[in-house]
Structure formats: C-alpha cells, structure tokens
Curated annotation (Swiss-Prot):
Zn(2+) 1 binds at C42, H67, E68. This is L-threonine 3-dehydrogenase. Pfam families: ADH_N, ADH_zinc_N. The gene is tdh. InterPro entries: ADH-like_C (IPR013149), ADH-like_N (IPR013154), ADH_Zn_CS (IPR002328), GroES-like_sf (IPR011032), L-Threonine_3-DHase (IPR004627), NAD(P)-bd_dom_sf (IPR036291), PKS_ER (IPR020843), Zn_alcohol_dh (IPR050129). NAD(+) binds at I179, D199, R204, L266, G267, I268, I290, Y291. The record marks D152 as: Important for catalytic activity for the proton relay mechanism but does not participate directly in the coordination of zinc atom. Belongs to the zinc-containing alcohol dehydrogenase family. Homotetramer. The active site is at T44, H47. It comes from the Bacteria. It comes from Rhizobium johnstonii (strain DSM 114642 / LMG 32736 / 3841) (Rhizobium leguminosarum bv. viciae). Catalyzes the NAD(+)-dependent oxidation of L-threonine to 2-amino-3-ketobutyrate. It is an enzyme of class 1 (oxidoreductase).
Amino acid sequence: MSNMMKALVKAKPEVGLWMENVPVPEVGPNDVLIRVKKSAICGTDVHIWNWDQWAQKTIPVPMVVGHEFSGEIAEIGSAVTRYHVGERVSGEGHIVCGKCRNCRAGRGHLCRNTLGVGVNRPGSFGEFVCIPESNVVPIPDDISDEIAAIFDPFGNAVHTALSFDLVGEDVLVTGAGPIGIMGALVAKRSGARKVVITDINPHRLELARKLGIDHVVDASKENLADVMKAIGMTEGFDVGLEMSGAAPAFRDMIDKMNNGGKIAILGIAPAGFEIDWNKVIFKMLNLKGIYGREMFETWYKMIAFVQGGLDLAPIITHRIGIDDFRDGFEAMRSGNSGKVVMDWM
C-alpha cells in the first residue's frame, strides 16, 4: 500500500476544497485504518466549502474534511482486538475523551472534549480514514455501502426523533432537508398519530412526499393552523422536531405546540434570534438540544430501523464519482438535493 492517498482538502482559507495527494494517516495501537468506499456530503462540509464565519473560526488549514462514510478495514493497530482487515464498517464521527464525568458515566455523546472527524482531525474525504477502535461500527451484510455512508445524518434524525415518546402523539417537523425527512419517517414508524413536516423549498417538499410523509406543508403558502384543522387536530402538537435552524419556523412551532409539549432541537439557528419565552413558560414546554448521536445506542436503533424495512435510498438524490466532487457540492449548495453520495472505488 502506498503511503500517499488522494483526498479532498481545505487547503486554503477561502471558498472551495481541493483534491490533493496527502500522507495516509498513521495507525496507532488502538486505531483502525479504513479504506473509504463511499462518502456523503454533510451540511457541515458545505459550511467548510463556503468558508463562512463558523468555518473560519473552527477549521484548521490545511485539513482533510468529511465525516460521513463507509468502507472496509485496511489495517488495524497492534492493540485492536474486535475487528479484522476486510470487515465492512462505518464510524462514529465524534471522538470523545473517555475521561470526563459524562464519558465515565456512559454518556459519551455529552463529552465536553469531543473532537470531530473532518473538523478537528483528518476526515473521511480521502481514500483512507483513521479512527479509534472504539468509534468503529460494523455494517451488517444486508445494509449497502451507500446507506451505511449516510448513517451519520440518519443517526442525528433517530436521536432527535426518539428523544421523546412518540406513540399516539402528534408530531411537527420543521425543516424538510434530508435529516428532517428521515426524522419524520422515524416518527411515523415509531407509532406517531399525525406527522406534519414544513419547509419553504419546493424541491425538499416534493422529496418529503416521495418518501411517504403524509402531511407536507409549504410554510410560504399554507397556514399551519388550517392544516391542523383539516387533518383533525383539535389541540396542538405533542412533539416538535426542529430541524431547520430557521427562526420563523421555530417560532411557529412554539405557537402550535400543545401545553406540556416537548421540542427536540437539532437545527442550528442564527445567533441572537428572538422567541417569546412567555409562551415557552406558560405552555410549560420542554426544550432539548440535540448534537450528534447517543453512543452507541442510536447506532443500534438506526441499524434496526433499516433492517426492519425503512427504505432510505430515495433520500439519496445524487450518486457521483469522487472526481466529480464539485458537482456534488454544487447540488448541495443549491438546496435542490437530498443526500449526495460520492464513490471512491
């Protein structure tokens, strides 16, 4: 195996990514080197491409980016015991310290010292990625490489949707991007009574319909209160899944929640936007922030959903070779795509 590999690198502090030859990551005693077969583009990667304010403050240059992937093990460290070369795997993209109170209590997703693959350390937009053995997730034979490559965002959806009991509940999802749609699908399969998803992007609304969401609302044209009445809702929503990061959508969600409603918030909103906290207080709402996946309970649950028949394939709207990565990022930046999966083989 060559000691150099092809990778997408944030090589300059400006808009874009560049394909370069970089060293293959070194494998420590507790590490696993994975030959990447499929990579998916995340919204985080788009922020890095755009070199926005968050990226400028967060991403060291140069950096191999990317964190949504699947592949097979190419090499294992001397102390690795659970995996073998050739095994099909994906990986948890949050590297935790294992030493803080939350880690030692089994709450690794709450680690204060989390490092992100492709953000704080070299990522998976390369022919190889190296992660700790503890972050490796084996992929069952009945799950394809491309579905495994989107397990990271699917895990965000599963973690968000399953934050609260859904059986018999009316659920509002704001934001019909891929994670929002997957969250709505999880809610539907988990026994929710009514599942409503809102957005203002026609392409995303059509994608939600294609994947079988029953109540798809164009918030730029339809009044959510009228939709609720039309589908037989006499009270507000019991559970809200905020996936949009859009202040108007979040405010509308708060307005439409039932007293005692519960909201899981994954969408990253602009800093400093206003909400009416009196409504939160007097409605006695429960707000919960979500970041990433529970380690590793969420992974078990998402694998079970897929093996149980949840078809995520239609959420992948673009399948391209890695050399066409610019086309993939153009599709993502346009807002007129679902997931974009890139093939390294």
